[in-house]
Amino acid sequence: MPRAAKSSRKKDPNTPKRNMSAFMFFSIENREKMKTDNPDATFGQLGSLLGKRWKELTSTEREPYEEKARQDKERYERERKEYDTKLANGEKTGKASAPAAAAAAKEE
């Protein structure tokens, strides 16, 4: 039975970027070294190797990444709250374009 087409809702480009997990911070920091150590590994294989290495880390070794994840979560929650407040107030969520800002400044 064919699926019904999902309605394509336009995503607001000004929506705050989601927070990253501790593992994502670890992956970003270690992917290049892992790629150098395993030059023939595919993207998926690198992901598996990174996951395996992540599981081997002690809680002490994970702490810097966990802290970055906590800070990023706080950033996301703060930005999301500001974004939602602007939406609720009917304000535009984007920044004014340079020509519009220049025109507004010129009128003053």
Curated annotation (Swiss-Prot):
Domain of life of the organism encoding this protein: Eukaryota
Ranges of compositional bias, category Basic and acidic residues: 61-85
A GO term for molecular function: DNA binding
Record flagged with keyword Transferase: no
InterPro entries assigned: HMG_box_dom, HMG_box_dom_sf, HMGB
DNA-binding region coordinates: 16-84
Knockout mutant characteristics: Double-knockout with abo1 exacerbates the sensitivity of the abo1-knockout to methyl methanesulfonate (DNA damaging agent).
Subcellular localization: Nucleus; Chromosome
Family in the record: Belongs to the NHP6 family.
Protein's name according to its UniProt entry: Non-histone chromosomal protein 6
Organism: Schizosaccharomyces pombe (strain 972 / ATCC 24843) (Fission yeast)
Taxonomic path: Eukaryota, Fungi, Dikarya, Ascomycota, Taphrinomycotina
